[in-house]
Amino acid sequence: MAIIYLILLFTAVRGDQICIGYHANNSTEKVDTILERNVTVTHAKDILEKTHNGKLCKLNGIPPLELGDCSIAGWLLGNPECDRLLSVPEWSYIMEKENPRDGLCYPGSFNDYEELKHLLSSVKHFEKVKILPKDRWTQHTTTGGSRACAVSGNPSFFRNMVWLTEKGSNYPVAKGSYNNTSGEQMLIIWGVHHPNDEKEQRTLYQNVGTYVSVGTSTLNKRSTPDIATRPKVNGLGSRMEFSWTLLDMWDTINFESTGNLIAPEYGFKISKRGSSGIMKTEGTLENCETKCQTPLGAINTTLPFHNVHPLTIGECPKYVKSEKLVLATGLRNVPQIESRGLFGAIAGFIEGGWQGMIDGWYGYHHSNDQGSGYAADKESTQKAFDGITNKVNSVIEKMNTQFEAVGKEFSNLERRLENLNKKMEDGFLDVWTYNAELLVLMENERTLDFHDSNVKNLYDKVRMQLRDNVKELGNGCFEFYHKCDDECMNSVKNGTYDYPKYEEESKLNRNEIKGVKLSSMGVYQILAIYATVAGSLSLAIMMAGISFWMCSNGSLQCRICI
C-alpha cells in the first residue's frame, strides 16, 4: 500500500506553468568581447569591409585623369608624347603609373616635384592660360627643339614651354612679365638650361656667365647655368632644370635672362579645388562608378572600416589592420539541450534559448489544459531592438568620418623624412586598429550584458505580478497554485494579471500540497525500515546458501561442536 501511495505521489499531475525565455536560432556568427572569444550570437553586424571590385572607376560620376605612359611632369610641361593631355577636363583623381615612360624627354630635373604632386591632391581642374605668347620674343629664336623629344623623327620640344636661343648671333636681355588677373591662383613653370660645355653655351646663347632671374611679391630667384661634362641621357650631356611657383591673384611674375631661359608659354589657373590625389596604378579606367577608390579597386560600402589598402581617395571608411570587426546585435545563441527538457541559463537561471520563438528576442512559453505555446514579449523586444540599432548606428556614425589617405612622395634627399613619415603613418594605423578593436570588444560585452539584463527584468516583472500564487521552479519557470487558462496566461503576459482573483484558490492549494508533503514523511520512514530489514534478510539467506554449497562439495570443512 505504501509503495502504491509513493508512486501516486511522484506521478501527480503537474500544474499549469509559464516560463520566461529568449530566442535562439541556427546562427553560427561569432563575436569577441572583453572577457570571451568566439561567442556564438543570434545576430551580428560586420563593420569591416574586406572586398573591392578590382577596378579603377569614376569617382562620384567624375572620371579620373588617366595619364597613361605620361608622368605628371610630362603632362604639365607638354611632352610631345602626351599631346592628348594638352587640354583635360575636370578630374576626380589622377592615375599615374609607378614608372611612367614619358616624363622629361629632355633629361634634367624638376625642383620641388614632390611638393607639386602634393599640390595636385587639392586640385580638380587646371585651365590653361597663355601668359607669354611665343611670338612676343621677337629678338630671340623660339623654335628650339631636340631629337630627345622628337616627333615623327623630327626635333621637337615641350609644348607648353619656349626655349629661347640666339637670333642672328645675338642674344639680348630677355624680359617678360605676366599679371594674374584670372581671379584664381596660377601655377607657373619655367626652366634653366645647363649646357654640356662652353662651346654649346656660346652656340646657343652667344654669352657666357648668363643668368635667369624670376621674381614675384613672394619669390626672388636667380639662377646661373652649370656648364659641365655629364654622362649622356637620351643622347644628351646637357640638362634642363625646371622650377615652379604659385602666382597669387593680382600678383605679377617677372622674367629676366641673358641666356639659358626656358620660358613658360602657358600657365595653369587653378579653376577648381577639391579633394583629389594621385593614384599609383598600372590599371586602366573601366566603366564603373564608386565613392571610394584604392589602387587595388573600388570600395562600395557604408561600413566604417576597411582593410583593403591603406591608400584611398574619396569618401572612404577608415583603414585598419584588423581581420575581423563584428558587432553583436543579438543574444548569446545557446539553443536548448533536449535532454534537459524545454527550459533550463541565460541571466543565470535559464539554460537554453527557444528556437520555437521566432518573432522576438524575449518571451514566454506556457502550458495548461488548453495546450502550450510560445509568445514573444513585443514591448521589451522592440525597446531592445531600437536601443541596439541606435547604438550600432551611433558607433558607425562616430567612426565613419570619411577618410582619405593619399601617398606622400619624397625626393632622394628626404629619405629620412620618408622613413619617419612611414613610421608615423604606421603608428596612426596601429592606434586606429587598436581603437576599433577595443570599441567592438567593449560594445559586444555591453550588448550581451544588456540582453541578460532584459531577460532578468522580464522574469522579475512576471514574479512581481504572480507573487505567492505560484511556485518558482528555479529554471525561469513558475508553476501556478491555481488553474490558469489561456485568458489568465495572456493577462500575465500583458501585465494585467488579477492577483486577488486567484489568491484564495492558490492559498488552499498551497496549504494542501504542504499537508501532503508532511503526511508522506511517515511513509518514507516505513519504507526505509522495510528496505533495511529486507536487504539484511536477503544477504543472510545468500550467505547461508553459499556456505551449504561449499560444505557439500568439500571446499569448506564444517564442524559442529556440542
UniProtKB/Swiss-Prot annotation:
Enumerate the Cytoplasmic topological stretches. Answer: 547-562
Q: Which GO terms describe its biological process?
A: clathrin-dependent endocytosis of virus by host cell; fusion of virus membrane with host endosome membrane; fusion of virus membrane with host plasma membrane; viral budding from plasma membrane; virion attachment to host cell
As for subcellular location, the record says: Virion membrane; Host apical cell membrane
- Tell me which positions the record assigns to the signal sequence: 1-15
- GO CC terms: host cell plasma membrane; membrane; viral envelope; virion membrane
This protein's membrane topology, according to the annotation, is: Single-pass type I membrane protein
Q: Which residues cross the membrane?
A: 526-546
Q: Where is the lipid attached (S-palmitoyl cysteine)?
A: C551, C558, C561
Q: Which residues are exposed on the Extracellular face of the membrane?
A: 16-525
Question: Can you tell me which residues are glycosylated?
Answer: N25, N26, N38, N179, N180, N300, N494
**What Pfam families is this protein classified in?**
Hemagglutinin (PF00509)
List the Gene Ontology MF annotations in alphabetical order.
host cell surface receptor binding
Q: Which residues are in coiled coils?
A: none
- Record site feature (Cleavage), residues: R340, G341
Paired cysteines (S-S)? C19-C477, C57-C288, C70-C82, C105-C149, C292-C316, C484-C488
UniProt modification remark? Palmitoylated. In natural infection, inactive HA is matured into HA1 and HA2 outside the cell by one or more trypsin-like, arginine-specific endoprotease secreted by the bronchial epithelial cells. One identified protease that may be involved in this process is secreted in lungs by club cells.
Q: Which UniProt keywords apply?
A: Clathrin- and caveolin-independent endocytosis of virus by host, Clathrin-mediated endocytosis of virus by host, Disulfide bond, Fusion of virus membrane with host endosomal membrane, Fusion of virus membrane with host membrane, Glycoprotein, Hemagglutinin, Host cell membrane, Host membrane, Host-virus interaction, Lipoprotein, Membrane, Palmitate, Signal, Transmembrane, Transmembrane helix, Viral attachment to host cell, Viral envelope protein, Viral penetration into host cytoplasm, Virion, Virus endocytosis by host, Virus entry into host cell
Origin, by domain of life?
Viruses
Q: HAMAP family of this UniProt entry?
A: INFV_HEMA
The entry's function note states: Binds to sialic acid-containing receptors on the cell surface, bringing about the attachment of the virus particle to the cell. This attachment induces virion internalization either through clathrin-dependent endocytosis or through clathrin- and caveolin-independent pathway. Plays a major role in the determination of host range restriction and virulence. Class I viral fusion protein. Responsible for penetration of the virus into the cell cytoplasm by mediating the fusion of the membrane of the endocytosed virus particle with the endosomal membrane.
Indicate the family of this protein.
Belongs to the influenza viruses hemagglutinin family.
The subunit structure is:
Homotrimer of disulfide-linked HA1-HA2.
What additional remark is attached to this entry? Major glycoprotein, comprises over 80% of the envelope proteins present in virus particle.
Protein name stated in the entry: Hemagglutinin
Report the source organism. Answer: Influenza A virus (strain A/Singapore/1/1957 H2N2)
Output the lineage of the source organism: Viruses, Riboviria, Orthornavirae, Negarnaviricota, Polyploviricotina
Encoded by which gene?
A: HA
